[in-house]
């Protein structure tokens, strides 16, 4: 299935699941959508936190199509699930933004670690959340983001349990792709990140961590949602964690070496 065909399946309501493992050679994107009045500070926030918020594209006010991300792409309809925040609180999840869309909305598309999972799988590195048919586990850490204006919050990380040799190979592979979070930020000791229980993720689903495996943590594009919550904007929108926008950008084109 091509990315365009996948987006059409989302738009028609046929696909409403987490997007890990879909259209493997193509990059997926996190979304943050907010009024133009706050867009400059949010852009500065992303630039100050490039590990968690690597920008793939930024739209013009009111634009719900970003040609840099793909043809026949509609931000309002092509994500399986959206989070709607009002005054910093998650008030609802919706499957379309057509009724909520405003002429002053600015779209920020942020790289997603689902993008490099295809490369890991090609190297024979098994990914537990895909094996178990679950959403990837994501955790809010105790590490503060670099603040920009009203935007701060804490770093969010995704976790994949790997054996030592696979963890080393994963570092080597993902280091080539800073546009989709790059190398892990931590391996092995969740408490050093302020994570008390791997079995209780803040977002996504818990997965099995087997004996002899290390939890490997990558910076996560859900990080901006902690900033949106802390800023308490009257209205802001994001993807539901794990339910991403499929782009036409090839993962290979994002490699830096």
UniProtKB/Swiss-Prot annotation:
Give the molecular function GO annotations: lyase activity
Q: Which UniProt keywords apply?
A: Lyase
Which Pfam families does this one have?
Answer: D-Glu_cyclase
Q: Name the top EC class.
A: lyase
User: Under which EC number(s) is this enzyme classified?
Assistant: 4.2.1.-
Give the family this protein belongs to, as stated in its UniProt record. Belongs to the D-glutamate cyclase family.
Name used for this protein in its record = Putative hydro-lyase BamMC406_3459
Native species = Burkholderia ambifaria (strain MC40-6)
